[in-house]
Amino acid sequence: MSGNLTQIEQDLRQSSEALQDLRSKYDGALLKIGEANEACKTELESKKTEALEALEASKSEQNVKIAALEGKMEELKSRFITDDNQILIKVGNNADEGEIASLKEALNLALQYAPSVPQSVTREKNRVVVEIQEGWEWVEAIGLYHIDLSHIILTQKNFDVPIMCDFSRENMHADNGLLVKLYLDNSKISIKKLHLKAKAKELTQNACWFNNYIYSRFGSGVFIEHLKLDSSLLTTANCGQAGDYTIFTDDGSQLLAHKIEIIKSNATNEGFCVCENSRAYVEYLTLSGGNNNYNGVFINTASSAYVGNITISGNSGHNGVLISTASSAYVGNITISGNSGHNGVLINAASSAYVENITISSRSGHQHLLVDGSRLTNHASCNFTGGSTGNNQKLAIVRGGLATVAGNGYSRGAGNDANQAVGVWSAHGSWCFYGNRT
């Protein structure tokens, strides 16, 4: 019996010790769990604090960026956006007033801002305007290749004060033997009003036949409200070669203009040219000033033109108006008061023309009007009051030409005798008069 009690006592003692050991392990485990929880809590709080601090820093950084962006927007708005919600970029010499010195830079900037104008804005206001300020001089040439700037309006603040243009070779765009101030290759541009005047320059120094203000080719388009080109200060010691070609539309290009004024000089070769399957629509075309070397107006090689009024003063070395090589033209009025070295109006080489009124009050070296293998319809009047030199023929039709004069035809004076009447001359061609002829 005593042996059993002893065994029970030992078993209880061992169980108690095991329980104490288990209790100790349990307390140790709880302590470690508490320590782990505390460590996790501390780490979590630390990460939370770091995240909040990073968030606040990011918000602060974003606020700085937003403030900078808002400031930039306000700057751009005050600098460029007008009351009409147009974007106005000024080209000039006053950087403090936000003016940009480079026209090329201004056009690039305009090209960037153009898509940002809201579509909800009306068409009259949905545009970007590049405005040249008074006193700015055009030095850096511009070449446009495969770019459409027709939605950007190029203009100047004061049309009465010309923009002086540097025609030095190093400041002209060179391409395929051409020197040009504004060159377009498969490109488009819109001009509201520009008055350009070339600075004094001897063009033989450029070693180039073609010196132009604007030359467009290869499917380009030029849209003009009012353009005035003044070449009166240009000179050349090599007449007929190194010269000025003002504005030239070439190689399948288009010209749409309300009014173009050209002031020629002895350095001007062609006054106004539309060539190589090109198209032109001009309401008012005026040529004045000095004596150009070739033609006043030249429409050539399968080209076509509508010109409301052509007015030419100042002599033309060859022809006042030449329509040539399968070209066609409608002209409302041709008025020539400057002498022509060859013909006042020449239509030749399978070309055709419809002209309402032809008035020539000056002298022509050959004929006032020559239709050579071509067709002319003169609807209203054909009035010649100036004498001719050379063969003294006022009206001439040759080599299969046909001229229809539906209005009154006048032929008065020849050579140096304004009272000497002259008839109509025709060789292998025919006139058809529907009005009076004196």
Model-derived regions, located:
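Short, low-complexity N-terminal tether/leader segments at secretion or assembly junctions of large
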Residues: 1-75
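Generic short N-terminal amphipathic or hydrophobic helices
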Residues: 7, 162, 298, 309-311, ...
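Cysteine-rich, disulfide-stabilized extracellular repeat modules
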Residues: 40, 51, 62-65, 96, ...
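Right-handed parallel beta-helix/beta-solenoid
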Residues: 71-113
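Flexible, charged surface loops at secondary-structure boundaries
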Residues: 82-85, 121-125, 146-148, 183-185, ...
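N-terminal extracellular ligand-recognition/capping segment immediately after the signal peptide
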Residues: 95, 104-105, 115-177, 196
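Glycine-rich beta-solenoid repeat tracts in large extracellular/virion proteins
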Residues: 142-146, 163, 173-185, 202-218, ...
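Right-handed parallel beta-helix
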Residues: 155-157, 188-198, 218-238, 251-266, ...
